[in-house]
């Protein structure tokens, strides 16, 4: 009954992935981000990640697989998703939702840490504020965006952009693939240079 729709959805996902894969800049940005994070861990720094909605789930997934595990057993890596419900509700209530991530970065971020901001539009005001707070703390910044990068375009040390202009779920599908590859590369880099 729905088999044609299922095939169509999978083919659209495949096409989005093939379009992303066809541009070497995307491959390089994933490698650059992985090296930046691995170098941060080697220097004693940590990763803070943030996003809204599905991107919030991706930020938590990223931190969880860094602190827990991906494919192989290895030591946990220092990563925190800005996702504590009491922090989010307190700051949203007292200061406004636009400050939920920046307040956390101001409190916990240190020079040499990395902020990973995830936004399919590249226009999330609370992530833009977090980027500003990270810069003020001397942190490096990686963003995962979509479309033309939005207001975040050019704001990061590394941007992994999915140039898809349809529904956001296609961008999120590439984001989670990029996140899994990042973790794989980080693990290889950490083992290779111990």
From Swiss-Prot:
It holds the Pfam family SIS_2. It is found in: Cytoplasm. Residues 37-194 form the SIS domain. Its cofactor is Zn(2+). It catalyses: 2 D-sedoheptulose 7-phosphate = D-glycero-alpha-D-manno-heptose 7-phosphate + D-glycero-beta-D-manno-heptose 7-phosphate. Binds 1 zinc ion per subunit. Belongs to the SIS family. GmhA subfamily. HAMAP family: GmhA. The reaction produces a racemic mixture of D-glycero-alpha-D-manno-heptose 7-phosphate and D-glycero-beta-D-manno-heptose 7-phosphate. This is Phosphoheptose isomerase.
């Amino acid at each position: 009954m729905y088999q044609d729709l299922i095939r169509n959805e999978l083919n659209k996902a495949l096409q989005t992935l093939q379009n992303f894969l066809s541009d070497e800049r995307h491959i390089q940005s994933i490698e650059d981000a992985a090296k930046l994070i691995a170098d941060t861990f080697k220097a004693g720094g940590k990763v803070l990640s943030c996003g809204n909605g599905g991107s919030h789930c991706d930020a938590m997934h990223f931190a969880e697989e860094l602190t827990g595990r991906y494919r192989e057993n290895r030591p946990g890596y220092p990563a925190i998703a800005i996702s504590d419900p009491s922090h989010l509700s307190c700051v949203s209530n007292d200061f406004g939702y636009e400050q939920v991530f920046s307040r956390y970065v101001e409190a916990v971020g240190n020079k040499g840490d990395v902020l990973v901001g995830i936004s399919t539009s590249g226009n999330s005001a609370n992530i833009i504020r977090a980027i500003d707070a990270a810069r003020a703390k001397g942190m490096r910044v990686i963003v995962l965006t979509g479309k033309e990068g939005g207001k975040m375009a050019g704001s990061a040390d590394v941007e992994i952009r999915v140039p898809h202009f349809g529904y956001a779920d296609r961008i999120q599908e590439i984001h989670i693939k990029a996140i899994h590859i990042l973790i794989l590369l980080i693990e290889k880099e950490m083992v290779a240079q111990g």
